[in-house]
Amino acid sequence: MDDIQSAALAIEQLKNCVYEITLGRKGKLTRIILAFTEDDLHHLAGLHKLVDIEQIRSGKRSRIYESILSGTITGDFLKKSARYHEIEARIQALVYLEDMLDGDQLYFKYDPRKKAFSRIEADYLVSGKANNTPVYLFLGSRSDDTYYCRSFFPQ
């Protein structure tokens, strides 16, 4: 099993989990409910960056996810992209996302206007470790207290 298939299996495991996180600041509590779907793999692994692979660029996310799980799309196939080197570390760290979420992490309210270098639209930045590698996880809001993972990458 290669890294991308391991990452897809990690997301598959997380689909069965819901994280309920309560944050407190200045006497105010904020509730975050974090859930996962197969669509999360595409962006978290950075597959959207592989614009030179037609099947990845224009394919339906759920179909790509299933193809990775079944072994039809492999790491060797993705490595044909000239941009694979940009996402390789993300894929390797993504395998340990559940460990990161179950471990110690810091949550920060995220204001994209203060990060001119970033185009990430998110509500929270989570800093933690995945397999002893420092990583950032960005959370976006689906509704009042339901969130999804918007982006993920090693520091």
PLM-predicted stretches and their roles:
Residues 127-155:
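Compact beta-sheet-dominated globular domain cores
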